[in-house]
Amino acid sequence: MQEVTFFFDDSGVFHKNERSGYFVYAGYVFTNRSTLDAAKRKYINANKALKKALGRNDELKAAGLSAKHKRSLFNAVKEYDSVSVTVNLSHIYDHILSKKHSICRYKDYALKRCIKGKMKALIESGVISKTEDITLSIFVDEQLTATNGYYNLRDSIIEELQFGISNFDYGIRHQNLFDSNVYVKLLYCDSKTNYMIQASDILANRIWASYITKNRNLRSIDNHIALTLP
């Protein structure tokens, strides 16, 4: 059984008054356990060293760190595969931005597109096979949970990858990626206990900050696949 593991966090507010004008999902992707464990060790070591230097024992969130300290955490795991999807909020219809359910649907759609883009790249590069069964484990910060959103998002990812159905692009049918069974585990986690979600918070904030500071170099990341919507 093939396995791919994703970790995600977000940055920005999905609202027309968001000061950067953008909403970002970003995170890390692993195709084997040994690489994931190595990344986790590196991030934990960098995290502990920074906590010691700062005299802190709470969770280190990007919003409460200086650019220098965020950079040190980012550098600890920058060699690993990562992904992001950035939503240009100025191009999102008001009727979507004005309804909580519509916002949740669009955010799920964005996350699904991001995952599909990476899976397509993994197939094209020969890292995974489209004809073998596969399990996706997707770890997301629990604060991103939408009411009744778990099964909608999980089932939607399976449909998109295995059957080629898109529920948001009305009237458009996307080709399926896999000619095999796709299993999805969607897990909402407390970021306090998940270091790769903490690393994803740093990454998402870096991409979001690139729009605030108008510094495109912050988005120049090796081994990274970036998607922009709509």
Question: What are these language model-derived features?
Answer:
Residues 1-230:
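Phosphate-ester processing/binding pockets and catalytic centers
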